[in-house]
Amino acid sequence: MSSIVRAAISGFNETVGGIRAAQEKFKDTQEHFVSLMVFCDCEKRLVYDKVPVDKIPELTSKDYRPCCCTPLYDAMGISLSALRNDIKDKNDATAVVTIITDGLENASKEYRLKDVKALVEDLTNSEGWTFAYIGTNQDVDKVSEDLSIRNSMAFVDNEDGMSAAWNLESNSRMRHFEMMSADFCATQGMSSQERKLFRSRKNAETKYYDEDNENQNNNDKKA
């Protein structure tokens, strides 16, 4: 990601701004926290760990310095397992997980593909988590399918491509939060586990990256 680091940082900060807007818009039904793991062969580090969105400082080049190899499976396995353990006893807690990488897995030591795939499937089907995969310099559809991630997007490996990917991600996330707010009213009276299964079924039926809808919205703005 070193060639597009400026766009990656800017896009992340804009996405956090969108989550803040969602927090305000849906404050009666949602409370948002943000985690960010950066990873390479040198380190796998949580920059933010379940920080309330209104307390997230701006990400800078001091926080994010990509280099060397891509231990994708380790980064996913470590961060997802930790988050699952942290929120397992919190009623109605769920997660929207976006994975962004400019390269294929090539450096993991603790987790294998089958381990991460099983973890994603369990969190998706049993806990109602939402996963999205954004990548470049790879067959994104195949990689996401191998990981059992239903939502994926490829981007062009330059600043414009990275910016466009972040824009679609931010808009998709806001639509997802709107859906979650509507579902909150529809699931009153359900048990916590019933709500998780409801979210899982709804996620399976819904396109997270609805590019047709995105294009229509852009055309409406121009008109």
What positions do the PLM features span?
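Acidic, low-complexity intrinsically disordered regions
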Residues: 1-223
